[in-house]
Design a protein with these regions (language model features):
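Extracytoplasmic thiol/disulfide redox context detector
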Residues: 1-81, 200-215
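Long, low-complexity, intrinsically disordered polar/charged segments
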Residues: 1-3, 98-103, 134-139
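Solvent-exposed, flexible loop/coil residues
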Residues: 28-31, 81, 120, 165, ...
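Loop/turn elements at helix/coil->beta-strand transitions in domains of secreted/extracellular proteins
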Residues: 37-39, 68-71, 95-100, 132-133, ...
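Acidic/histidine-rich, surface-exposed loop or edge segments in extracytoplasmic proteins
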Residues: 40-44, 85-86, 177-184
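Structural alpha/beta surface segment adjacent to cysteine/selenocysteine redox centers
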Residues: 47, 53-125
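C-terminal cap of thioredoxin/glutaredoxin-like
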Residues: 131-215
Length: 215
């Protein structure tokens, strides 16, 4: 048996029944959701985070395949000195442009060495897109984006966010790529990210079942 096959089999076994406290954990205080019958799935991420960059295409594709089962939301975390990246994401979000430019913003940081740490660097990024600069910076400097600074700070505390990427399912179930391979020894980042998907599938199904039973 090859190492790759052995890992794949272990992932399949793990995905059958993720364990609370290993592949996922319950938040101490569940948070409210507003997604009706659909299951809310939140990703906390940062553009500067290499692990978030590696996960982005995999998680984005997974979310698209869920169709009407879920509502997928992203929140850029807050750290001192990265407010410009936070504002960039939220400006894109307010303009309905996240899906179009999310991977491009990641690429700017990780491939093109534009650190997006200043307004000038963000302007350089915008100049290489089809975004209207005036419209973008109106959103970037808006009161709405400033209000989100405080909101996300509170959310990070409420959702117990200490590292990223972190995924929250149904406002109460936390997982991440590293949690998804708990106890599996040394694995590659690609293997971590691939192992996350069956855990997410299981958590979404669990949340759906429990939501239906509560009616």
């Amino acid at each position: 048996m090859t190492l790759g096959l052995g890992f794949a089999m272990s992932v399949q076994a793990q995905a059958a029944q993720p364990e609370q406290g290993k592949e996922y954990k319950n938040l101490r205080q569940p948070q409210p959701t507003d997604t009706g019958k659909k299951i809310e799935v939140i990703e906390f991420f940062a553009y500067y985070c290499p692990h978030c960059y590696a996960l982005e295409p995999i998680l984005s594709e997974w979310a698209k395949k869920q169709g009407d089962r879920i509502v997928f939301k992203r929140y850029h975390v807050l750290n001192p000195g990265i407010e410009s990246q936070f504002k960039l994401f939220n400006a894109l979000d307010s303009l309905g442009k996240v899906e179009e430019y999310q991977s491009k913003a990641f690429d700017a940081y990780h491939q093109q060495r534009n650190r997006l740490m200043t307004d000038e660097q963000v302007a350089e990024f915008v100049s290489k897109t089809k975004l209207d600069k005036t419209t973008f910076f109106s959103a970037y400097n808006s009161f709405t984006v400033k209000m989100k600074l405080n909101r996300v700070q509170r959310m990070m505390a409420d959702y117990e966010i200490e590292s990223w990427p972190t995924i929250i399912v149904d406002g109460r179930l936390m997982t991440s790529p590293s949690m998804s391979v708990a106890g599996k020894g040394r694995v590659t980042e690609q293997q971590q990210n691939e192992a996350l998907l069956p855990v997410l599938d299981w958590l979404v199904a669990k949340a759906q079942k429990e939501k239906s039973a509560a009616k």
